Amino acid sequence: MMYTNNCVNCVNIPGNRPAARALVQGSPDYPLLHGTVSFYQTEQGVLVSAEIFGLPSHTQPCQNPVFGFHIHSGTSCTGNASDPFADTLTHYNPSDCLHPNHAGDMPPLFGNDGYAFLLFLTNRFTISEIIGKTVVIHDMPDDFTTQPAGNSGKKIACGVIMNSRR
């Protein structure tokens, strides 16, 4: 579908209710980090909305925190002492693309005094593909270059994507 500059109501959200949702919780090092990532199926693709609270913040100029944000192929937010979310595995990448073209590569979260809000439309995945997968927030921004996953640091928060229309 090609968009024109006279598009009105280009993204129609049927029922205004997300088809899937992930409740994100921080690791033991980030117990106040939490939020919701919602997925809405539209005719144009999947509309993703993320609202995150308790992100690490900086007080120095030019150090506004930016966080890597991805869908991972694992189905659990469990792990071990050194990597509490090790079981999230790698970025969701069913077509075996190079980074940053994994289906699970999403725009970064920009922190604002511990808060981030993000809204974007994608055709990289469908909602049925990602049910049961995990959403992960990393402590560093994705550089969109380094292989295989963008060098975005340690995993600081995770949520499992669940069907919300049951």
Where are these regions (language model features)?
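N-terminal leader/targeting pre-sequences
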Residues: 1-166
